[in-house]
A protein has these predicted regions:
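Catalytic core of the metallo-beta-lactamase
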Residues: 82, 86, 176-236, 255-259
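Cap/insert and terminal regions of metallo-dependent hydrolase folds
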Residues: 17-21, 25-27, 123, 147, ...
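Divalent metal-coordination and catalytic microenvironments
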Residues: 85, 95, 128, 135, ...
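Structural motif
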Residues: 90-92, 122-123, 180, 212-214, ...
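Metallo-beta-lactamase
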Residues: 49-70, 150-212, 293-318
Length: 318
């Protein structure tokens, strides 16, 4: 049975503690200018409008969650960057989004299962404020007086949704909740949700639970910080983004599949699970291309057996 955290603290409290991440913030924010090879293309006519006429794929099916023993981790990919991570004690939900639209961007693949099929959620993590990671409509339905962790500056976007307490984390800071240790890590991205809120931070999460360690990267371009993350934590499972690398702005904000393999090697993790592809068309690359390129790169590096390409809604015990 999932544990239940104490509910004695006041609802909607935002706790903010500074870690040692100031230097990392200065070096990981993306620059506004496009990369040198960028060729301007029309995202509206090339991607957004054609996507409106693509039939939404994927099937909702009640998930068959297995019994989890001590020392095991069960991971279910919901779609995009959304994951359910389970131990024999705790259910953790990361970057949940069940919405059919990101404003004008159509969801092209359904979530692996309906939201009401979720088990009781003990803890929620949101990596940053972008609409494809922080979906207030979904979070409002998920919130049931449990804690949520977000980067510094993001708490005011979730504090009114029904969570018991909001933990705003700085880079390398850890919050302990029951059997969980949750740490925020740097990434190379940006955190603004609108035009005038670039103060919001962004990052990934390292989750230590049940004797295992999982790294959810959030959104990130490749950057040298992956090696430091691997030095600080012994990572078993790395959830790494592989899509939206042909960004319409030309900014280097997402890894391509080959860079994800490079990041995985520097993290020195045991298993690579790709994410952030196939759900929303956020870049110019074809929807089917990211996993194909990932597997080709993994074969070239002799690590194909370490890559686990998941199917939405199908739990996997590791």
């Amino acid at each position: 049975m999932p544990i239940r955290f104490s509910k004695k603290s006041h609802r909607n409290v935002v706790r903010q503690t500074s870690g040692d991440g100031a230097a990392a913030k200065r070096s990981t924010r993306v620059r506004l200018r496009p990369h040198a090879d960028w060729h301007k293309r029309n995202f509206l006519t090339s991607v957004l409008i054609p996507s409106l006429f693509i039939k939404r794929s994927g099937n909702h099916a009640p998930p068959q969650f297995p019994k989890i023993r001590e020392g095991e981790i069960c991971i279910t990919w919901i779609g995009h960057a959304s994951f359910l991570v389970q131990t024999h004690e705790v259910n953790i939900l990361i970057d949940p989004i069940w919405s059919k639209w990101l404003k004008v961007i159509k969801r092209l693949k359904r979530p692996g299962f309906e939201l009401h099929h979720l088990p009781a959620i003990d803890f929620v993590l949101v990596t940053h404020a972008h609409f494809d990671h922080l979906d207030r409509r979904t979070l409002r339905r998920v919130a049931a007086d449990q804690p949520i962790a977000v980067p510094i500056g993001v708490g005011n976007l979730v504090h009114d949704l029904g969570f018991h307490i909001v933990h705003e984390l700085d880079y390398w800071q850890t919050v302990e909740l029951g059997p969980l240790k949750i740490s925020l890590t740097p990434c190379h991205h940006w955190g603004a949700r609108f035009l005038a809120d670039s103060h919001r931070d962004f990052g990934g999460f390292v989750i230590a639970a049940n004797g295992r360690t999982i790294f959810h990267c959030g959104d990130s371009a490749y950057f040298p910080g992956f090696k430091e993350i691997g030095d600080r934590y012994k990572i078993d499972i790395a959830l790494l983004p592989i899509g939206a690398y042909e960004a319409p702005t030309g900014r280097e904000v997402h890894m391509n599949p080959e860079e994800a393999v490079k990041a995985f090697l520097e993290l020195r993790a045991e298993t690579l699970i790709p994410m952030h592809y196939g759900t929303f068309r956020l870049g110019f690359e074809p929807l089917h291309e990211p996993p194909q390129r990932l597997l080709a790169s993994a074969r070239a590096h002799g690590i194909e057996e370490k890559v686990l390409v998941m199917t939405e809604g199908k739990p996997v015990v590791l």
